[in-house]
Amino acid sequence: MASAVEIVSGRDVPVTIGPYSPATRVGELLFVSGQAGVDPDTGEPAGDGFGEQARQLFRNLEAVLRAGGSEPSLVASTTVLVADMDWFAELNELFGEFFSENPPARMTMQVPLPKGLLISIGCVAVVRG
């Protein structure tokens, strides 16, 4: 019997830094692990600044969403982790650009992040019908 949980992968999907999947698909829902502002080829942070990392994060997030059969306008909920709330205004600007259509629910928290990362976003999205 096939598993009800499908692991999402693809050429443009960044490799995770631990023993977890970039995303899983269950029926019409896509559960995306925390994506970060890393270069998908090297796994290293895409720069030292918040803006650089956030822009790369949104490129990575879009790649994972598309690999799982979804898109930004179908994201229902996000969990945003930032290393410093001083970037909150810039986060709002970039978040609004990426989710310009049907902005999702969002929870934002300040937490320490590993490996020089400044932001991480996980989400739940609907799969295109």
Locations of regions flagged by a protein language model:
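Short, polar/acidic, helix-capping and beta-turn segments at strand->helix junctions
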Residues: A2-G129
